[in-house]
A protein has these predicted regions:
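C-terminal accessory domains and tails appended to enzymatic cores
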Residues: 5-18, 24-42, 48, 138-219
Length: 219
């Protein structure tokens, strides 16, 4: 069995989209709110199972990682947060880089030799790594309109992951992943699933407008 565990924000979703475009795999999905960092506690695995973990703190899940490895699982772990001590184990592959210019999707883009950079750019914008996103976009010679669309998508998908419970969100992260992963590129998603793109971006814009109105009223 294959299990994909990923943060429900733009970085986690776009990282998994890249991997599954490159390596299609039927998998159990485990995800949650942006603040749900101990996602591996929800994972049950057996010897020989393959687990992919994306944009989830290694340090916060290190005990569970050890347990899963001892049960015979194989783990591929990609993240950009401080990991603590990473164990040496033949069944653990960890691609972890804590440089403040990278996010998990940029690491996956590097791992895949730049196969799906548009998804990495989207995630970088969502993680507020605007300079990194623009640097990668410059190599692709994107128009300003294209760049703006990727930025709007990244910000809106990232915002969708904030809430106290799944019902607070416009879309559950696993649902949003399934909708987005049906497309080769973010541009295909934006044009091919306009209803969800519009709901995401308008939901973000409306909430920001409401917040500004409350701030103005408070003053």
């Amino acid at each position: 069995m294959h299990i994909d565990i990923f943060n429900g924000d733009a970085d986690g979703i776009c990282a998994l989209i890249q991997l599954r475009l490159a390596e299609p795999q039927s998998a159990q999905l485990i995800t949650g709110l942006k603040r749900d960092i101990q996602l591996l506690d929800r994972c049950s695995a057996q010897a020989g199972d393959c687990i992919t973990v994306l944009d989830v703190s290694f340090q916060a899940n290190s005990k569970r990682v050890d347990e899963l490895l001892n049960q015979g699982a194989h783990i591929f772990y990609v993240d950009h947060h401080q990991p603590g001590t990473i164990p040496q184990h033949p069944h653990l592959t960890a691609l972890i880089d804590t440089d403040n210019t990278v996010c998990t999707s940029l690491l996956v883009n590097r791992h895949l030799n730049g196969k799906y950079p548009l998804w990495a750019i989207t995630a970088a914008f969502g993680d507020n790594l605007n300079h990194s996103a623009e640097q990668l976009a410059a190599r692709l010679k994107l128009s300003q309109t294209q760049l703006d669309n990727l930025k709007n998508l990244g910000i809106a998908v990232n915002y969708n992951s904030y809430g106290s419970c799944i019902s607070d969100l416009h879309f559950a992260p696993d649902t949003l992943y399934r909708e987005m992963s049906a497309f080769q590129s973010p541009f295909d998603f934006i044009s091919g699933n306009r209803a969800i793109f519009t709901q995401l971006t308008q939901g973000y814009q409306q909430d920001m407008a409401n917040a500004q109105a409350l701030t103005a009223e408070y003053r």
